[in-house]
From Swiss-Prot:
Family: Belongs to the peptidase M17 family.
Cofactor note: Binds 2 manganese ions per subunit.
Keywords attached to this entry: Aminopeptidase, Cytoplasm, Hydrolase, Manganese, Metal-binding, Protease
The species this protein was found in: Acidovorax ebreus (strain TPSY)
Name of the protein: Probable cytosol aminopeptidase
Lineage of producing organism: Bacteria, Pseudomonadati, Pseudomonadota, Betaproteobacteria, Burkholderiales
Keyword Cell inner membrane: no
Function per UniProt: Presumably involved in the processing and regular turnover of intracellular proteins. Catalyzes the removal of unsubstituted N-terminal amino acids from various peptides.
GO MF, one example: metalloaminopeptidase activity
S-S bonds: none
Length: 496
């Protein structure tokens, strides 16, 4: 599917040949004398159309319009949230076999973020998973034209939106694949395909190299599986070599049975989505390759399965992480933090400006925040503010959670430097406190996407989040023209 941006008035849109012409009608719509304006004004006057987001009126082959079908679509304030809500009402239309060309015309100047919301809505709504289906109909929609009053002014937002859409789709594709079609090796191969883009490099380490690095926690999780682990290292070089990179670390558990601490059978199939963090890193690099921002980024993906086996790690086992710290594994189903802790230690070799890890880490975060916002934990206030702002801009929001030092008390162990779990209470926070022990003084953030990486039920499938958040964050960093002094790490202290 291709997107294109054109300067297109309502008068010109009437002559545009397509299968579906969507006219976004905002509050305070001011009609002109053209046929589409007249049609819209008449529908509003008669009460057949409301400007409330998502309210629509379908017209088939109206006189003077070249499109086969016209939809007048209310979009309220025409901001990003309203446009997304409006476009979601049209999602079924984007999958119709008869709809191959769509034109989307803004009835007024688009507010900031509205174009991105429209592009993402069309991309998400038309997405079709086909990788393991023999009779699936491929995506019918081939071309989407966005008509705006001034295409030149809208071009930067449009470029970002289409790149993010491509990245989100790449992430969804790999997170959706069944575990036997997305093994650690296959995920690593997907990362290698990104190296075809200018500025992107990829290196993959196997069990032997990982063992030499001393990644005992990562190795412990992988030892119960016949599928060999992979440590993927992606690099995007868009700035001078002297510029410190941002390191993204994505949890890559390609299937999580829980190990010896076996999960319940119900909905265990959804544990193929446990590599949502890894998929988001792949998606971010797909977008970076298209946007080519002036920034250096490293992506790390520790990929393996968590399986029960005679060789599997057992509750009570003590392992030595790459950092040298020992860990008592009280629950083998708390494996994500084990693979991440070694990858976070490895990240230090790049002398990063900031580290952000992304993981479907805890059910506790789902309980706390549901499926709307990802959980954000950060050791640095400025980094937290940047990620919160990026999430809002991308309509991919997160919510900052506490990191009081007292939450780490439950990680104490009689037999190791720390345990890998600290009980049920505050589970998402104690998991973040565990990870914090492996990042030193580097500005660090942890995104718990357990509630946002996929949807269950009839709409089961990966969402591609938080690719949008991360891309917007990186683009904002890239726009900073001067190198700011390194921010001092600030942990939240107890208020008691």
């Amino acid at each position: 599917m291709n997107f294109e941006l054109k300067t297109l008035s309502l008068a010109a849109a009437a002559a545009y040949k397509c299968d579906l012409l969507v006219v976004l009608v905002p509050e305070g719509f001011l009609p002109g004398s053209d046929v589409l304006s007249t049609l819209t004004a008449h529908a509003l006057k008669q009460g057949d159309l409301e400007v409330k987001p998502g309210k629509l009126l379908q017209c088939y082959a109206p006189a003077g319009v070249a499109a086969r079908r016209v939809v007048l679509l209310g979009c309220g304030a025409a901001d990003a949230h309203a446009v997304r809500q409006a476009m979601q009402a049209l999602a079924p239309s984007f999958k119709l076999p008869s709809v191959k060309r769509v034109a989307l015309v803004f009835g007024t100047s688009a507010q900031r973020g509205a174009i991105g919301a429209a592009v993402r809505a069309v991309s998400d709504g038309s997405y079709v998973y086909t990788a393991t289906k023999t009779k699936a109909e491929p995506r019918a929609l081939l071309r989407v034209t966005l008509g705006v009053p001034d295409a030149g002014a809208a071009q930067p937002e449009f470029a970002t939106a289409t790149a993010v859409a491509a990245g989100v789709e790449f992430a969804r594709e790999w997170a959706n694949r069944p575990a036997n079609h997305a093994t650690p090796t296959l995920v690593a191969n997907a990362a290698k395909t990104l190296a075809k883009y200018p500025g992107v490099q990829c290196q993959v380490l196997g069990p032997t190299e990982v063992a030499k690095l001393g990644m005992g926690a990562f190795l412990a999780v992988a030892q119960g599986s016949d599928q060999p682990l992979r440590l993927v290292e992606l690099r995007y070089n868009g700035a001078a070599r002297t510029q410190a990179p941002v390191v993204l670390v994505g949890k890559g558990i390609t299937f999580d049975t829980g190990g010896i601490s076996l999960k319940p059978a119900a909905e265990m199939d959804e544990m193929k989505f446990d590599m949502g963090g890894a998929a988001s890193v792949l998606g971010v690099f797909r977008a970076l390759a298209e946007l080519r921002p002036a920034i250096n980024v490293v992506g790390l993906i520790p990929a393996c399965e968590n399986m029960p086996d005679g060789k599997a790690v057992k509750p009570g086992d003590v392992v030595t992480s790459m950092s040298g710290q020992t860990i008592e594994i009280l629950n083998t189903d708390a494996e994500g933090r084990l693979v991440l802790c070694d990858a976070l230690t490895y990240a230090a070799r790049f002398k990063p400006a900031a580290v952000v890890d992304i993981a479907t880490l805890t059910g506790a975060c789902v309980v706390a925040l549901g499926g709307l916002r990802s959980g954000l934990f950060a050791s640095d206030d400025l980094l937290a503010e940047q990620l919160l702002s990026a999430g809002d801009a991308a309509l991919d929001p997160c919510w900052r959670m506490p990191l009081d030092d007292e939450y780490a008390e439950g990680l104490k162990s009689n037999f190791a430097d720390m345990a890998n779990v600290a009980g049920r209470a505050g589970g998402s926070i104690t998991a973040a406190k565990f990870l914090q022990r492996f990042v030193g003084d580097t500005p660090w953030a942890h995104l718990d996407i357990a509630g946002t990486a996929w949807k269950g039920g009839a709409a089961k499938g990966a969402t591609g989040r938080p690719v949008g958040l991360l891309v917007h964050y990186l683009l904002e960093r890239a726009t900073v023209s001067t190198v700011k002094p390194k921010q001092k790490t600030r942990s939240r202290k107890s208020v008691a």
